[in-house]
Amino acid sequence: MEAYFATFRSPGPELLKVGFFTLRWYGLLIAFAVLIGLNLSNKLASIKGLSKNLINDLLPILVISSIIGARAYYVIFEWRNYSGSNFWSSIQAFGLTISIPTFIKVWQGGIAIHGALLAGTIAILIFCRLKQEDFWDVLDVLIPSVALGQAIGRWGNFFNNEAFGLPTDLPWKLFIPYPYRPEFFLDNNYFHPTFLYESIWNILLFLCLISLIRLSIKGKLKLPSGSLSCVYAIIYSLGRVWIEGLRTDPLCLGGVPPFCIGGIRIAQLISTILFGLGLLGLFWIYQRKKKLPSLGIIGRKHQ
């Protein structure tokens, strides 16, 4: 007997539609993740002794830059789907048909977490310099919320019927409707729920980071500036390299999905680099007993 209780099936990307207004699950999940992250980061910032309202001031810049970065990163590596005859698209609004570049339609999916991390990091760098805050302290305060936000946001992939893995008959398989299946797998009904794998992995990562913070508060562990961010880079990258190998829609360098034959999966490459940087960072902090490079950021003004 098939274990239907463990088979996933998306109800669709839209939660509510009234006239031209559409509330999508993905957008709702991102908003939910941002609110939770704001509350958590403010608490951690208070424990860290950072400036009051620092996170509140940073949040709008961080959210906007991360969304732009996530979309731009995806579009760059998938440009073949947004160029030529695919460059222009149309939307219906206020009874009008409006032509817009296709890459603007972010609500249809197509974002990459590594792009968000890159753009977000740059935004934090600039913000910290302007506010005279220590970059690594601020990043360490934010990083648990990043992990938790990723765990929540991955469910947006579930509702959008995207970012799923290779075909499988495992009890926890994910049903993908025919229109969403890759051309290579049109005859397959069930696929690995890679969104679930990464969501669970990120929850475990979040719990690990919070546990380290608690040990630090109790005086049982020293967490120098940047150490928490290095732990995130190591653990997240380990999971992403494995999970990315299952996906049917990877961003490829020198190849094409679903297998990137003749090329490499970008996410695996970036994750490998981040893993190495994370290890190097922890070695620098705990073995060399040195602070991580300041990256040109001025020290905290209230120290």
From Swiss-Prot:
The chain crosses the membrane at residues 18-38, 58-78, 107-127, 193-213, 266-286. A 1,2-diacyl-sn-glycero-3-phospho-(1'-sn-glycerol) binds at R154. Its EC number is 2.5.1.145. Signal peptide: none annotated. Keywords: Cell inner membrane, Cell membrane, Membrane, Transferase, Transmembrane, Transmembrane helix. It is an enzyme of class 2 (transferase). Pfam families: LGT. Pathway: Protein modification; lipoprotein biosynthesis (diacylglyceryl transfer). Catalyzes the transfer of the diacylglyceryl group from phosphatidylglycerol to the sulfhydryl group of the N-terminal cysteine of a prolipoprotein, the first step in the formation of mature lipoproteins. PANTHER family: PHOSPHATIDYLGLYCEROL--PROLIPOPROTEIN DIACYLGLYCERYL TRANSFERASE, PROLIPOPROTEIN DIACYLGLYCERYL TRANSFERASE. Belongs to the Lgt family. This is Phosphatidylglycerol--prolipoprotein diacylglyceryl transferase. The gene is lgt.
